[in-house]
Amino acid sequence: IYGSKVQYTASMYWVLGFIFLFTLGGLTGIVLSNSSLDIMLHDTYYVVAHFHYVLSMGAVFAIFAGFNFWFPVMTGLVLHERLAKAQFIVMFIAVNMTFFPQHFLGLAGMPRRYSDYPDSYFMWNQLSSYGSLMSVFAVLLFVLIVWEAFLSQRSLLFVDATLYSREWSDGYFPPDFHSNIYQSYITIYKTYYSK
């Protein structure tokens, strides 16, 4: 969240989604740190939901944030912003629909690594399955967005209008030959940092 002025781009949506999901997974980790509860919940779907919130969605959302942010730097093309935001919303709803009901399944005692379960777990399992299908749709939508960016060849209009981070200071692509002989400098404008 560079420069303390948050711009709600698609990559910022992914960053904020990562922070939310990682925090929620961390809060369930606090529950599991209680040894008496951990004995009861250890081999249940509560643990599955916990580590998917922390590890899987944490990594996936951070990767999507980085890809959305650095795609223009890597290719010189821009992703369709509205479609990228829509893809985030679909994915955010889908992963919460997949893994949040698993907390209730774990609290109800549904064990891990079983091939068949009683019918009392059907409703939450069905909701979780619909969420996973929705996640597949969100990933296919992401592939479609990248494909559309390459087909439309929508390039950056102004390199100067981009962010003031190190990645954007050298232009579109890395030079063909790079050495540490010549240093590049970043110009810091006084208007951005004056009080």
Curated annotation (Swiss-Prot):
GO-annotated cellular components: mitochondrial inner membrane
Domain of life of the native organism: Eukaryota
Enzyme class: translocase
Binding-site positions, Mg(2+): H42, D43
Membrane listed as a keyword: yes
Membrane-spanning parts: 12-32, 59-79, 88-108, 131-151
Subcellular location, record wording: Mitochondrion inner membrane
Binding residues annotated for heme a3, in chain numbering: H50
Membrane topology: Multi-pass membrane protein
PROSITE patterns cross-referenced by the UniProt entry: COX1 (PS50855)
UniProt GO BP: electron transport coupled proton transport; mitochondrial electron transport, cytochrome c to oxygen
Gene3D superfamilies assigned to the protein according to its UniProt record, in alphabetical order: Cytochrome c oxidase-like, subunit I domain
Subunit structure as annotated in this protein's UniProt entry: Component of the cytochrome c oxidase (complex IV, CIV), a multisubunit enzyme composed of a catalytic core of 3 subunits and several supernumerary subunits. The complex exists as a monomer or a dimer and forms supercomplexes (SCs) in the inner mitochondrial membrane with ubiquinol-cytochrome c oxidoreductase (cytochrome b-c1 complex, complex III, CIII).
Name of the molecule in the record: Cytochrome c oxidase subunit 1
Organism this protein belongs to: Albinaria turrita (Door snail)
